[in-house]
Curated annotation (Swiss-Prot):
It catalyses: NAD(+) + (deoxyribonucleotide)n-3'-hydroxyl + 5'-phospho-(deoxyribonucleotide)m = (deoxyribonucleotide)n+m + AMP + beta-nicotinamide D-nucleotide. Residues 587-671 form the BRCT domain. Zn(2+) binds at C401, C404, C419, C424. One of its GO terms (biological process) is DNA replication. SUPFAM superfamilies: BRCT domain (SSF52113), DNA ligase/mRNA capping enzyme, catalytic domain (SSF56091), Nucleic acid-binding proteins (SSF50249), RuvA domain 2-like (SSF47781). GO terms for cellular component: cytosol. Transmembrane segments: none annotated. Its EC number is 6.5.1.2. It is an enzyme of class 6 (ligase). This is DNA ligase. The keyword Magnesium applies. Keywords: DNA damage, DNA repair, DNA replication, Ligase, Magnesium, Manganese, Metal-binding, NAD, Zinc.
Length: 671
């Protein structure tokens, strides 16, 4: 019988885990432990729905489908900021401040996050409502979608009733992954992380918002004075004590020279941030002085946003090449004269699809403007038409696949052209490269160049052929000596023991990513069970939507897939889930239960992944950084700063041999 006290305890534990991971960026547990606690919580909620509150961590995963977004009136208007584009604008702003309140001033300088301004309401410390800025007076209610952002606490550390303002955003890495998925699926790409964040928060299906990995920084309260603080900087510190995520890169500046230094610093460093910023915000720090300055109808007189100039670089578009992805999507790529953009040299940029090329009237031979979307992905902004000479050539997508000559099609609701020939050599080659990649079967020594050689020499035609390669055939490859071939064959052999989720992800089933593959493997345990699953069963699993379920059913209905799986079985490839199931182990077996272990340096007998998997299978958590919460540091050769920090904190340091003694005998390691 479920215990309500245990239920409340689980909520507090999961809230703390989320705070550690998403707010202060100091994870204290591994995903497996978090997932285990969440599953326990979900089982209790299923048995006792009357206990569930809006603050439950289970509400973060989405699932609610909204009918629309109702209007919300802000108690205090969400004003926009006036802009400064140069130092003269900042000097004028500073002069107006000094003329009004005198020279005893300071400015809190903060990074201007390029996202979507939102408002969060807490009542007695509990998250009540979230809204967009809208026109500043009336916004849209996006309470459910904001709840899916893990860095937004559902309960504050104190029972305040406050309205907090902040910027929701999509980290660069999440943006890149999202666009890669959308491109593979033939969907329109988001132009930048800001648009992606805004689009995600306006999804009627909250599961979609939850899948987008959004984040937030909070930067103000509707009225800081209600919190008993006298300065904006003290107010930000107070927000942190409440468990809210505030950007750490803020600085209190006493004069304009310090402000300029801060701007110069972040103009240089912004490309290295994990999120987009488009400027610096200055705020008069003293709250009483803010009140003296007042506001205009649109913006406060005590704050201003300095906007970074956009880095747009001209270069020549030499050609447009076509690439065929593993799912058949045809992607046009701009071949450019190499040019430096946002810190790196760019020679190629995706043009995404034919519609975009037509819309922007991009021609071969044009001088084009280049920037990096999210400071990561090279993007052609536009052609500089006034520099055309008449020699430029319009581009037209072909009607047939550039690799296999099959007719290209545009599927319903897709903007991309796609080759649907399952025997297309380009798709097979890309599928092979994906199959051996690190997140899939992780076969060391079998990189893209080796795959291309094997494929072009007709030594492999599908993924099963990899497991029947002989030493003699591999020695025929360029730059493959005796030692390289021996190591490669050992790596191929070792990959046969991978757990089911690795194989599933490697097979490249459309719409099935690494996370979904893990969910499928854990649920079905064997490939045979998964093969016969129907759509209803599949959609009952977390992370599996209707589109993905349809794709899985279609995939396993293919006779060629059945033949491929039989060949993989014949090769000895494991088709069962072999990951840790902590709930089935005794306390005596879980020798690392509750302990955090850090691995550093080069291990001789174990690979890093093997050591991590073994520690986790015995209840331990493997962390990437050393802190006071670390229980053991395992140091191999060439250990660096982590070892030094462990010594400084007096944390026990083990050798690899010490670790092996604590582990079960795996493949003769203890001999």
């Amino acid at each position: 019988m479920a215990d309500k006290k245990r239920y409340e305890e689980l909520i507090n534990i999961l809230d703390q885990y989320s705070y550690d991971y998403y707010v202060i960026d100091n994870p204290t547990v591994e995903d497996a432990e978090y997932d285990q606690k969440m599953q326990e919580l979900l089982k209790i909620e299923e048995a006792h729905p009357e206990w569930v509150t809006p603050e439950s961590p289970s509400k973060r995963v989405g699932g609610e489908v909204l009918e629309g977004f109702k209007k919300v009136e802000h108690d205090t208007p969400m004003l926009s900021l006036a802009n400064a584009f140069n130092r003269d604008d900042l000097a004028d702003f500073d002069r107006r401040i000094r003329d009004k309140v005198g020279d005893d001033i300071s400015y809190m300088c903060e990074l201007k996050i390029d996202g979507l301004a939102v408002s969060l309401q807490y009542e007695n410390g509990k998250y009540k409502q979230g809204a967009t800025r809208g026109d500043g007076t009336v916004g849209e209610d996006i309470t459910a979608n904001l709840r899916t952002i893990r860095s937004i606490p559902m309960k504050l550390k104190k029972a305040y009733s406050i309205e907090v303002r902040g910027e929701a955003f999509m980290p660069k890495r999440s943006f890149q992954k999202l666009n890669e998925i959308r491109e593979e699926e033939g969907q329109m790409l988001f132009a930048n992380p800001r648009n992606a964040a805004a689009g995600s928060l306006r999804q009627l299906d909250t599961k979609i918002a939850a899948s987008r990995n959004l984040d937030i920084f909070l930067y103000a309260v509707a009225d800081f004075g209600e919190m008993g603080v006298e300065t904006h900087s003290a107010g930000l510190d107070m927000l942190e004590t409440l468990g809210l995520k505030v950007n750490k890169e803020r600085r209190l500046c006493s004069n304009l020279e310090e402000v300029y230094a801060y701007i110069d610093e972040w103009t240089e460093k912004r490309a290295g941030l994990a999120y987009d910023i488009d400027g610096i915000v200055l705020k008069l720090n003293n709250l009483e002085q803010q009140r003296q300055m007042g506001t205009t109808v649109k913006s406060p007189r005590w704050s201003i946003a300095y906007k970074f100039p956009a880095e747009e670089v001209p270069t020549k578009l030499l050609d447009i090449e076509l690439n065929v992805g593993r799912t058949g999507v045809i992607t046009p790529t701009a071949v450019l004269e190499p040019v430096r953009v946002a810190g790196t040299t760019v020679s190629r940029a995706s043009l995404h699809n034919e519609d975009l090329i037509t819309e922007k009237d991009i021609r071969i031979g044009d001088t084009v403007l280049i920037k990096k979307a999210g400071d990561i992905i090279p993007e052609v902004i536009k052609s500089i038409t006034e520099e055309r000479t008449g020699s430029e050539k319009p581009f037209h997508m072909p009607k047939n696949c550039p690799t296999c000559d099959s007719e290209l099609v545009r599927l319903e609701e897709e903007v991309a052209l796609r080759c649907i020939n399952p025997k297309c050599p380009a798709q097979i080659k890309e599928g092979l490269i994906h199959f051996v990649s690190r997140n899939a079967m992780n076969i060391d020594g079998l990189g893209e160049k080796v795959i291309i050689q094997l494929f072009s020499m007709h030594l492999i035609k599908d993924v099963a052929d990899l497991f029947f390669l002989s030493k003699e055939k591999l020695l025929e490859l360029e730059r493959m000596g005796e030692k390289s071939v021996t190591n490669l064959l050992a790596s191929i052999e070792a990959s046969k023991q991978n757990s089911l989720e690795k194989l599933l992800f490697g097979l490249g089933i459309r719409h099935v990513g690494a996370k979904a593959a893990k969910s499928l493997a854990v649920h079905f345990e064997t490939m045979d069970n998964l093969k016969i699953a129907d759509k209803e069963t599949l959609t009952s699993i977390n992370d599996i939507g209707e589109k993905m379920a349809d794709s899985i059913v279609t995939y396993f209905a293919n006779e060629e897939v059945h033949d491929l799986l039989e060949e993989l079985k014949r090769a000895g490839v494991n088709m069962t889930y072999t990951g840790p199931k902590l709930e089935n182990m005794s306390e005596e077996e879980l020798v690392f239960a509750g302990k955090t272990v850090v691995l550093t340096g080069k291990l001789e007998k174990l690979t890093r992944n093997d050591a991590k998997a073994l520690i986790e299978s015995l209840g331990g958590n493997v962390s990437g950084s050393v802190s006071k919460k670390t229980d053991v540091v395992v140091a191999g050769s060439d250990a660096g700063s982590k070892l030094a920090k462990a010594e400084e904190l007096a944390i026990p340091i083990w050798s690899e041999e010490d670790l092996i003694e604590y582990l079960p005998d795996e493949g003769g390691l203890n001999e």
